[in-house]
Amino acid sequence: MPRFVYFCFALIALLPISWTMDGILITDVEIHVDVCQISCKASNTASLLINDAPFTPMCNSAGDQIFFTYNGTAAISDLKNVTFILEVTTDTKNCTFTANYTGYFTPDPKSKPFQLGFASATLNRDMGKVTKTIMEDSGEMVEQDFSNSSAVPTPASTTPLPQSTVAHLTIAYVHLQYEETKTVVNKNGGAVAVAVIEGIALIAILAFLGYRTMVNHKLQNSTRTNGLYGYDNNNSSRITVPDAMRMSDIPPPRDPMYASPPTPLSQPTPARNTVMTTQELVVPTANSSAAQPSTTSNGQFNDPFATLESW
């Protein structure tokens, strides 16, 4: 890409920062010539240059005045003197001439933006060398210089007719003003930039540590699974057992200590007691009576209902 394109991009990027505009937008101009009448007809017209720019307005006639309407096309980019050059061509019964008028007006810099304003300007005629061909009494046509005269005679007689010297303009315009909002400079910009960079670096470090921890944990699980079962359950790892073996065929790990159940010990059956303690049920022996349980000498276990007296 050529350097000129880079320069254009940089210029466009800087426009909102440095570009300001303070000018006017001319909407209507009313033109009146001090002598003779002008109109919008082809033989009696006027053209107006604004700052040497030939804007094309809409023309309307009203009596001895014409109105130029620009519809927002006549934009002036500053509030300095606005120069007008008016060219008038008049061909009427009592007045025939073509003249140029020049002048300027200064817009009011104190006018409020985007409000309609009015101003007036007087344009002076550029006299130059004015010549006219007249007929003398002898019938001969003679060209005379009327540059220093305020009146020009008609060709048919020596009676002078008034000559136009000035043109009056009334300008309606809108003050256009645009100024980019000033950016407040942050004095702590360097510190803020450093803090942002440090924050980004800290986030990157934490992300790296988290990723490394995840990878190590995954590797440990893979190693443990491979050591216990002979295969790795990770999708990204290689199976270490033959394809014919299924996961359900692999038994769970066993401790060698419990590979076989313990052998029961051989112990003699304990002898059955014939007489229990006083706190236990008495088991009768073969020599004892079936009706009466054996008792001790103190008669502890005598039947309390054995005699009628007990009732």
Swiss-Prot record:
Stretches assigned to the Cytoplasmic side: 210-311
Membrane topology note: Single-pass type I membrane protein
Protein name as catalogued: Systemic RNA interference defective protein 2
Assigned keywords, A-Z: Cell membrane, Cytoplasm, Endocytosis, Membrane, RNA-mediated gene silencing, Signal, Transmembrane, Transmembrane helix, Transport
Tissue expression profile of the protein: Expressed in the intestinal lumen. Also present, at lower levels, in the excretory duct cells.
Mutagenesis or variant effect for H175A: Reduced dsRNA uptake but complete rescue of gene silencing defect in sid-2 deletion mutant
Taxonomic source organism: Caenorhabditis elegans
Role this protein plays: Plays a role in RNA-mediated gene silencing by mediating endocytic uptake of double-stranded RNA (dsRNA) ingested from the environment into intestinal cells from the intestinal lumen. Selective for dsRNAs of at least 50 bp. Required for avoidance behavior induced by small RNAs derived from pathogenic bacteria such as P.aeruginosa.
Top-rank lineage group of the source organism: Eukaryota
